[in-house]
Amino acid sequence: MRQSLKVMVLSTVALLFMANPAAASEEKKEYLIVVEPEEVSAQSVEESYDVDVIHEFEEIPVIHAELTKKELKKLKKDPNVKAIEKNAEVTISQTVPWGISFINTQQAHNRGIFGNGARVAVLDTGIASHPDLRIAGGASFISSEPSYHDNNGHGTHVAGTIAALNNSIGVLGVAPSADLYAVKVLDRNGSGSLASVAQGIEWAINNNMHIINMSLGSTSGSSTLELAVNRANNAGILLVGAAGNTGRQGVNYPARYSGVMAVAAVDQNGQRASFSTYGPEIEISAPGVNVNSTYTGNRYVSLSGTSMATPHVAGVAALVKSRYPSYTNNQIRQRINQTATYLGSPSLYGNGLVHAGRATQ
């Protein structure tokens, strides 16, 4: 219920993305309207304020709509509107990806644990068809790109780290037997919005995903996004997110939320990557430098970034879910944290380097 489609009431975020207006006074921008549950519906908002509703969330009390400055001003005065925020841009956490053996994945594989039965939603630029990947399904929340096919490469790269097939070609993913779902929330340029990400989370909830990988981020917080994250957590989904690539303190959203495992990146020596954002929200670390994985055009490329570290953790989460099917999202999270290898300062490395072998014992 956070961003775009179906929800109820008013509140949250302003558009972030484009908007070529006609008359300045009539220019419309996208906002996320957070409302009082049961008090306001998209229909009542349309009728009372004559606004263009794009989406009403089902799981959270948020309406995604286009508003003029005059409409925005009126809505802010509505006592049933808790917040209104711009539908801010969300971008890829990437620089320019090795780490399967580094996190001791082979120990899990040697025990016959490959991720069978775990469902992982990759919220990204989509996933391209590739001989080293098996896509179980998906959806697109980019209006100009109705297919979940990846036209960028980032999502395909992330997907390969999670679950590239054990088929003797290309690369091997952390959980090669996990079910991958391509949820496109970023366009061909690697840009999306708070609304598209919230819709992707909502899709994951409605389609019973176990794990959500979010190798993306925004520097600004969002009531809508936080609502969606909390709803997914309550639905039993483990969310994993990229900390960011600024090299400075200040973890990106949604990774900064307590409902998301914030992932930092380390190099081949187990040292924090120079670009890896740090702060008290960091929960776990994983390989994120020169990571080789699947890419568009049936290719393989090496990329670096916390975007590349995050799917290592999502993959280990899939292995744990496969090893312990009855585990809740919180139990999986606790297992990963308790079995990590200590690396140093928690603000840099969190609980340490994720360890697939110990996590699946």
From Swiss-Prot:
Keywords: Calcium, Hydrolase, Metal-binding, Protease, Secreted, Serine protease, Signal, Zymogen
Record note on what altering K86E does: In strain: AH-101
One cellular-component annotation, GO: extracellular region
Positions of the propeptide removed during maturation: 25-93
Residue sites binding Ca(2+) 1 per the record: Q94, D132, L165, N167, I169, V171
Keyword Transport carried by entry: no
Gene Ontology annotations of biological process type: proteolysis
Signal peptide: 1-24
Main location group: secreted
TM spans (from-to): none
Catalytic activity, EC: 3.4.21.-
Temperature characteristics of this protein: Thermostable.
Binding site for Ca(2+) 2: A255, Y257, V260
Active site per database record: D124 (charge relay system), H154 (charge relay system), S307 (charge relay system)
Activity dependence on pH, as recorded: Optimum pH is 12-13.
Described purpose of this protein according to its UniProt entry: Shows keratinolytic activity.
Family of this protein: Belongs to the peptidase S8 family.
Protein name: Thermostable alkaline protease
